[in-house]
């Protein structure tokens, strides 16, 4: 039972946070009140720009130099954090309050062993001495369920999966047993089973230690599944606060209802995700001629388990070391077809081989064996570098996972969209190129005035539209979508999914949709393929696989998806 009689552990009152910019002062958080009780798990939900992360940075006193707390109070365990000295705050961070950041790889030092990074925190806060710090670090790795902790102690971040890196960040955050843990989007980019394992691990450890947790997320399903109370933020203000059991069943604010509507859930259609009053996508369909557009036959991709590949050795002018170990099979003899106008979902956990498969189908990666047949031509036999210059490249395009990372920061939106046209198209600059770019922008719903902006001047949804416009610029027959909505807010995701569905119908394209989110796959795909350890374990129509799964692994994926009460 929550401690509601005593004062809250964290008490935020009338907090206002401002940032100084070239265009004047921007208020990121305005007069908010939030409290966290001892032992409570509080969720703060909202879209990008709502102020939820800025609030957490203000609590930790790690605001950007341009930011400042303009008004209000932040009290932690009876201490006024606004007036605390920098030395006292540095001492409290890690020992009394700690934070899990959104990107685990960015939060870790890439050139320092993970075990040493845990030791740094223990030694900084005098939780260990040199004589026993290694033993304590290994014990903490064991607590966060890192397999073979003695071995992983010596690993660098790049040698670990995303899920393992997140566990290391959790280990560092909980090493000194703080009273308060702030988790800022701790599962973004993780597959559903890893997400479930990470969240259950965090809550298990915090409950064991009687800690309070603040979960910052845009995933309402996550908040519903793991939080006692939920705070909803919009444009820097708190618009609703209520117990999680209440807020999702009877949301009082229109913005909360909008977020609920946009969240994929069992039984929902693409149209259901849009705001009321928005026009429905085109209902046109494409008839297949019976021949597969893309046929994958017994496709295999192998990597050496140690040393360097022959290709790398040739590139660096070295001799590849001999190894007696069997190579690792990332993709192990899979076969499937994509018909014209069809959307095929390729799902599975991280490391299952789905992205490797999509990269080979896109001809960005050469297969070890097997065939990739595009409309009767075996393009798998053509080296990836050579294929990039062939006319057939125009027929297959890709929308990448992260709309920010996939755009050149030095290119304007127009330059990014027209890049494939300049490389492989028949329009060469001038007014014709601008007209074609504006046509594509209109097609994906990107306002013309944004074409001359750079990626950092665009929102996540706008960058996603640029990526889609670039992918369809050459009128491809097949578009490979690699987790295209994983990093987007739910309302933006809903719009992008409907846009993709409309474009497929209008332009007659086929999709290979790579994802770990089965709710999203069900909305967009006709056929679903489930991969595990490089092999296909189940496939069939979307309704068949997702409503009546035959394989235990598929059932585990479906069960791991958190979603708000229907």
Predicted regions: what they are:
Residues 2-8, 147-153, 244-295, 304-322, ...:
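Short catalytic/signature loops enriched in Gly
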Residues 69-80, 370-381, 392:
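Conserved ABC transporter NBD signature motif
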Residues 80, 132-151, 317, 378, ...:
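Conserved ABC ATPase "signature" region
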Residues 81-98, 124, 246-251, 322-325, ...:
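ABC ATPase NBD coupling module
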Residues 155-160, 164, 454-458, 462:
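Conserved ABC ATPase signature
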Residues 177, 475:
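Conserved catalytic motifs of ABC-family nucleotide-binding domains
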């Amino acid at each position: 039972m929550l401690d509601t009689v005593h004062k809250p552990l964290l008490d935020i009152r009338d907090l206002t946070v401002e940032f100084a910019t070239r265009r004047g002062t921007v208020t990121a958080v305005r007069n908010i009140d939030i409290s966290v009780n001892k032992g409570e798990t509080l969720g703060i939900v909202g879209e990008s720009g709502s102020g939820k992360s800025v609030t957490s940075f203000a609590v930790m006193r790690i605001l950007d130099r341009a930011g400042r707390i303009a008004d209000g109070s932040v009290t932690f365990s009876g201490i006024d954090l606004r007036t605390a000295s920098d030395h006292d705050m540095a001492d409290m961070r890690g020992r009394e309050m700690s934070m899990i950041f959104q990107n685990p790889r960015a939060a870790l030092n890439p050139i320092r062993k993970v075990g040493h990074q845990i030791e740094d925190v223990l030694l900084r806060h005098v939780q260990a001495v040199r004589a026993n710090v290694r033993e304590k670090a290994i014990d903490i790795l064991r607590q966060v369920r890192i397999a073979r902790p003695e071995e992983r102690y010596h690993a660098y971040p790049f040698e670990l999966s995303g899920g393992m890196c997140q566990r290391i960040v959790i280990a560092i955050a909980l090493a000194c047993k703080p009273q308060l843990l702030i988790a800022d989007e701790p599962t973004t980019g993780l597959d559903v089973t890893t997400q479930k394992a990470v969240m259950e691990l965090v809550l298990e450890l915090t409950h064991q230690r009687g800690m309070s947790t603040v979960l910052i997320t845009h995933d309402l399903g996550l908040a519903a599944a793991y939080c006692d109370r939920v705070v909803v933020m919009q444009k820097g203000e708190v618009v609703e606060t209520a117990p999680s059991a209440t807020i999702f069943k009877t949301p009082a604010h229109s913005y909360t209802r909008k977020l609920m509507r946009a969240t994929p859930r069992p039984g929902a259609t693409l149209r259901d995700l849009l705001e009321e009053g928005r026009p429905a996508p085109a209902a046109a369909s494409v008839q297949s001629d019976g021949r597969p557009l893309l046929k994958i036959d017994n496709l295999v991709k192998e990597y050496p388990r140690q040393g360097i590949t022959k290709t790398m050795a040739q590139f660096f002018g070295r001799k590849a070391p001999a190894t007696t170990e069997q190579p690792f099979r990332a993709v192990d003899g899979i076969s499937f077809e994509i018909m014209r106008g069809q959307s095929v979902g390729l799902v599975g956990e991280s490391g299952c081989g789905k992205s490797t498969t999509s990269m080979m189908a896109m001809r960005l990666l050469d297969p070890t064996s097997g065939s990739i047949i595009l409309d009767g031509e075996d393009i798998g036999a053509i080296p990836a570098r050579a294929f990039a210059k062939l006319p057939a490249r125009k027929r297959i395009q890709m929308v990448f996972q992260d709309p920010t990372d996939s755009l050149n920061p030095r290119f304007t939106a127009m330059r990014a969209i027209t890049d494939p046209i300049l490389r492989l198209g028949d329009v060469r600059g001038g007014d014709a190129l601008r007209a074609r770019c504006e046509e594509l922008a209109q097609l994906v719903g990107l306002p013309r005035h944004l074409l001359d902006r750079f990626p950092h001047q665009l929102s996540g949804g706008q960058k996603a539209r640029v990526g889609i416009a670039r992918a369809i610029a050459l009128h491809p027959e097949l578009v490979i979508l690699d987790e295209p909505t994983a990093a987007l807010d739910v309302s933006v995701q809903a719009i992008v999914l409907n846009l993709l569905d409309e474009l497929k119908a209008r332009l007659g394209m086929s999709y290979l949709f790579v994802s770990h989110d089965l709710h999203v796959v069900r909305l967009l795909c006709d056929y679903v393929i489930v991969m595990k350890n490089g092999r296909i374990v189940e496939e069939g129509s979307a309704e068949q696989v997702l409503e009546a799964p035959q394989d235990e692994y598929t059932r585990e994926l479906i069960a791991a998806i958190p979603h708000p009460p229907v």
